[in-house]
Amino acid sequence: LDDDARYQSRRLERRFPGHPAGRLLPAAQLGASDAEVGLRAAGHSIKVIEATASSAADLGKVLQQLKTDRVAYWVLDLPEAQFAQAVQAAGSSALLFNASAGADALRGSQCAAMLFHSYPSQAMFSDALAQYLAARSWRNALVLQGPEAADQLQGQAWQRAAKRYGIKTVDTKAFKLSGDPRERDLSNTRLLTNDRNHDVVAVMDADGEFARTLPYATQQPRPVVGANGLVALAWHTQWERNGGPQVNRRFARLAQRPMVGQDWAAWVAVKSIAALVSDHSKAALPEQARLLRSGQVFVDGACMTQPQAPAE
């Protein structure tokens, strides 16, 4: 979407941890380029096209055109609210890959047979953080909870992960960024973090603006985790294993910026599509979906499976 709030210039300039750093087209193009030799050897090719809608109201026309043009693989970079529309439009005529939305509902109540996720869920991010805290024996967390619906969903995922890995929430305090003088205490980081009985401060801030200045601003000298400080990411530009430096360098040359998690998810989605086209081109799309779920499709030597949200 041209008016996608995640890509407003102000937000991109802030470079909030875990947020997109730019549109995902360069990452998809890199995935196709990286897969070109293998595809050519198998007698196949793929073409990356960009389909954009000016707004959510115009999205239906764009999706219908993709279906009319028989585009069989869609890499989605959409807000969560538009996924149901994309799934309905595609039906069984396209495989869909979510490359940027971490909402747990897309893996649960809104799960679809033809929808796969190359981008991790909020539950996965929360599990990663909780596992690390447990490994370091940082068992007591002060939670700073934002007021927005997305903040609440982050908080719910965190509480499930914390319970699973034995992280105790010693207190939950609400924060709010506001120009109202009567609410200034809700944005006072020193006041919010004044208690001494916690090992870490876990901040649930989907927007990122409050968390942006929280590290090193707490009253007690404690690590900040969640939306800033120690952040669970799908990818980092300094990852040095599994061919990471080479991928990062190729992407930086193409996009003129570092690769972030959403870029990696788009890249690996296209690589997954290339693997399907190369090895299972004669299979119908529902059968290709089954092969993806069964772990029989290999991407760069690793099994590609559909991430699932942990059970309650």
Language-model regions, residue ranges each:
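Extracytosolic ligand-binding ectodomains
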Residues: 1-312
